[in-house]
């Protein structure tokens, strides 16, 4: 396993249908269906659409409160056509919560042969991705398996504590896939899920500081709410006795790149020694980087140190980003949004 998680390590496809990369239905095509009379021609054209486009069209009908269109499609499909019924169910999961409208359509499809376990329990996997607890419980009531694909619904729900807790209370394995859940919770800095898992027996010092390293190395560093959650997770782990000495030069460099003083303060207060970074530049055989040379040159020629740092590190970086990417950077060392 990697030294820390990336988004690709825990993001799973929400359904088999999402693996179909056929093009989305165009707005012109949606308009055409929207204006059509509900008749056999409508159904013939609907059946010709790829499955992904069928789901998208049904989703648009739901968003536009065109329930009659959905009812017409359901009532005019071949009895027990599990694939089409499943596609409509996936659209319902995305656009609705359990209410009278959902119940009416759901029961109508059940009466026509809807199988909530179709395609290896695709529906509950889809609902878990969207963390729709009311729909999840409805699917379980009609036979959906929460343990499908090695407790995939549990793994998909790490982002939302209420749904995650529901699966655990109903027998899902918190240690599945080499303690995947607590690793993903650390990547997301989900304090509630991480604390819950540790209280249920997960090791806070798994793989010699893996959780601490993952939080520090996480790509998700911007936004006041996330920063607060991240530091809360760090404080909790340090409070449990996880040692900061598991953080190496790689992690410390990442902390500095994040340009977040709150993160730096939490680490420093818990024993992290950033002076170890000096060893990166102690080898006299390694030539000084261009920026250091430029700073020394400008200071020796009368530019004060603060102005030099702002010019070289901030303004010139903006110039390079404009030149390469056509836009300025969102964050610079001299203008940190969350300190």
UniProtKB/Swiss-Prot annotation:
Keywords in alphabetical order: ANK repeat, Repeat
Start-end of each ANK repeat: 119-146, 147-176, 178-206, 275-307
Highest rank taxon of the organism: Viruses
Protein name: Putative ankyrin repeat protein L120
Organism phylogeny: Viruses, Varidnaviria, Bamfordvirae, Nucleocytoviricota, Megaviricetes
């Amino acid at each position: 396993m990697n030294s820390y998680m990336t988004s690709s390590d825990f993001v799973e496809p929400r359904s088999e249908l999402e693996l179909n990369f056929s093009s989305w239905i165009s707005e012109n095509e949606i308009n055409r269906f929207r204006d059509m009379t509900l008749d056999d021609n409508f159904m013939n054209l609907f059946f010709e659409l790829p499955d992904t486009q069928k789901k998208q069209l049904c989703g648009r009908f739901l968003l536009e409160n065109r329930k009659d269109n959905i009812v017409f499609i359901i009532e005019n499909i071949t009895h027990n056509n599990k694939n089409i019924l499943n596609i409509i169910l996936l659209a319902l999961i995305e656009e609705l919560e359990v209410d009278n409208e959902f119940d009416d359509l759901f029961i109508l499809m059940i009466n026509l042969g809807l199988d909530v376990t179709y395609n290896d329990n695709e529906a509950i996997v889809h609902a878990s991705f969207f963390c729709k607890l009311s729909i999840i419980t409805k699917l379980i009531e009609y036979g959906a398996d929460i343990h499908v694909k090695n407790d995939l619904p549990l793994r998909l729900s790490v982002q939302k504590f209420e749904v995650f807790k529901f699966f655990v209370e109903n027998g899902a394995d918190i240690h599945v896939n080499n303690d995947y859940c607590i690793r993903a919770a650390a990547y997301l800095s989900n304090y509630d899920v991480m604390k819950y898992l540790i209280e249920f027996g997960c090791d806070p010092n798994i793989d010699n500081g893996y959780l601490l390293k993952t939080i520090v190395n996480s790509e998700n560093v911007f936004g006041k709410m996330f920063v607060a959650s991240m530091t809360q997770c760090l404080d909790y782990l340090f409070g449990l006795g996880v040692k900061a000495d598991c953080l190496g030069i790689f992690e410390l460099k990442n902390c500095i790149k994040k340009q977040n003083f709150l993160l730096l303060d939490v680490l420093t207060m818990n024993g992290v020694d950033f002076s170890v970074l000096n060893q990166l530049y102690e080898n006299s055989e390694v030539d000084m980087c261009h920026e250091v040379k430029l700073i020394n040159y400008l200071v020796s020629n009368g530019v004060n140190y603060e102005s030099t740092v702002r010019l070289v590190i901030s303004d010139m970086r903006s110039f390079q980003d404009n030149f390469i990417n056509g836009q300025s950077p969102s964050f610079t060392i001299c203008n940190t949004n969350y300190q």
